[in-house]
């Protein structure tokens, strides 16, 4: 008996994002074989989005690009960004998921950022590079991310993405409630 397959395209080749998509889908659809593939997808926003709206738009742009390139059951994009809120600077990620003609948008948890990190980002640096310098790491954005470093490993970029994906999947899990 052949197992049913769900094909997922992730708008990034970053292993953290690909693993988060695979993990979330495996939790949501344990009876299916999940085939997850990453692909380079342009965000159409700055490499380090500095606003909530740019971050959200980057995720949407990546999903739309993937939909135009290859056939799949689901398309995922995760875009990390920063913004300065009334409580201070924070980093977060938007999740865009497309399935058939429907698009769902979700957002991961907010991680407060030290002001010195935010100031470096305002000066044009990317968060991963700033964190690598501050914590003497290499390519942290493809590992635990700023989340892993600032929480001392109690949460990671991947765990945040996985939870955000699960939440953003709600309209697909309950389509009758989301007309």
UniProtKB/Swiss-Prot annotation:
Per UniProt, where does substrate bind? 71-72
- Name the lineage: Bacteria, Pseudomonadati, Pseudomonadota, Gammaproteobacteria, Alteromonadales
UniProt catalytic activity: XTP + H2O = XDP + phosphate + H(+); ITP + H2O = IDP + phosphate + H(+)
Q: Which UniProt keywords apply?
A: Hydrolase, Magnesium, Manganese, Metal-binding, Nucleotide metabolism, Nucleotide-binding
Q: How does it assemble?
A: Homodimer.
Q: Which source organism? A: Shewanella sp. (strain MR-4)
Q: Which Gene3D superfamilies does the record match to this protein?
A: 3.90.950.10
Signal sequence, start to end:
none
Q: Which domain of life is it from?
A: Bacteria
Q: Could you say which cofactors this protein requires?
A: Mg(2+); Mn(2+)
Q: Does the keyword Protein transport apply?
A: no
Matching HAMAP family, A to Z? Non_canon_purine_NTPase_YjjX
Q: Which Gene Ontology BP terms does the record give? A: nucleotide metabolic process; thiamine metabolic process
Cofactor, how bound (note): Binds 1 divalent metal cation per subunit; can use either Mg(2+) or Mn(2+).
Family as reported in the entry's similarity comment: Belongs to the YjjX NTPase family.
- Protein name per UniProt: Inosine/xanthosine triphosphatase
Q: Which GO terms describe its molecular function?
A: ITPase activity; metal ion binding; nucleotide binding; ribonucleoside triphosphate phosphatase activity
Per the UniProt entry, the Enzyme Commission number(s) are 3.6.1.73
What biological function has been recorded for the protein in this entry? Answer: Phosphatase that hydrolyzes non-canonical purine nucleotides such as XTP and ITP to their respective diphosphate derivatives. Probably excludes non-canonical purines from DNA/RNA precursor pool, thus preventing their incorporation into DNA/RNA and avoiding chromosomal lesions.
Annotated Mg(2+) binding lies at: 71
- One Pfam family for this entry, by name? NTPase_I-T
